[in-house]
Amino acid sequence: MSGKDRLPIFPSRGAQMLMKARLAGAQKGHGLLKKKADALQMRFRLILGKIIETKTLMGDVMKEAAFSLAEAKFTSGDINQVVLQNVTKAQIKIRTKKDNVAGVTLPVFESYQDGSDTYELAGLARGGQQLAKLKKNYQSAVKLLVELASLQTSFVTLDEVIKITNRRVNAIEHVIIPRIDRTLAYIISELDELEREEFYRLKKIQDKKREARIKADAKKAELLQQGIDVRQQANILDEGDDDVLF
């Protein structure tokens, strides 16, 4: 296993616990991001369907509004200059709200009429019915345009957030979690190797002690056979020397 495939960390019990905690955190984060991506995808598809529906309806409404304008011009003449000379302020205005979807803030636009219709009775003498129909149709068109702008803004915002979220999900799933897994496997293998080395070292110490005791006992027996009393002699094996480490 190359160093690039795992995190640079010294193998120890503490490092093993740390990697297990990081793995659990990465898996939990992956699950939460996956749920967020699914929620955003559902809202994205819903908005896409509304955009298609609104655009289809928008074509019909604009056709009706254009036809109403032609009727009003035919019955009342050119009313453009009259409207431009008498207009003071916009009666249809836009207000914004915020919608939250899985932690993502989406702007929502709404149209509303500010005050009463100043020109409600305008044109009654000549084609008043056509003018009223014209205003109604263009109000519907403006309302749909505002709704469409709101939907398309949310669509673009969600599209970008979904791409970022999916990149994060893929990074955690295919890079971070596998790297932590490999690091954890490396730590476990190194700790196992250290345990085997420690066991071998202790076994060698015990073997050397046993060999030394056997030699001492053989020497003692030989001295006893020669009639030498060794009970009062110091035994080097009884001394409290430190164990020899190999």
Swiss-Prot record:
InterPro entries: V_ATPase_D. Signal peptide: none annotated. The keyword Transport applies. It comes from the Eukaryota. GO terms for biological process: proton transmembrane transport. The keyword Ribonucleoprotein does not apply. Keywords: Hydrogen ion transport, Ion transport, Transport. Coiled coil: none annotated. GO terms for cellular component: plasma membrane proton-transporting V-type ATPase complex; proton-transporting V-type ATPase complex; vacuolar proton-transporting V-type ATPase, V1 domain. Pfam families: ATP-synt_D (PF01813). One of its GO terms (molecular function) is proton-transporting ATPase activity, rotational mechanism. PANTHER family: V-TYPE ATP SYNTHASE SUBUNIT D. Subunit of the V1 complex of vacuolar(H+)-ATPase (V-ATPase), a multisubunit enzyme composed of a peripheral complex (V1) that hydrolyzes ATP and a membrane integral complex (V0) that translocates protons. V-ATPase is responsible for acidifying and maintaining the pH of intracellular compartments and in some cell types, is targeted to the plasma membrane, where it is responsible for acidifying the extracellular environment. This is V-type proton ATPase subunit D 1. It comes from Drosophila melanogaster (Fruit fly).
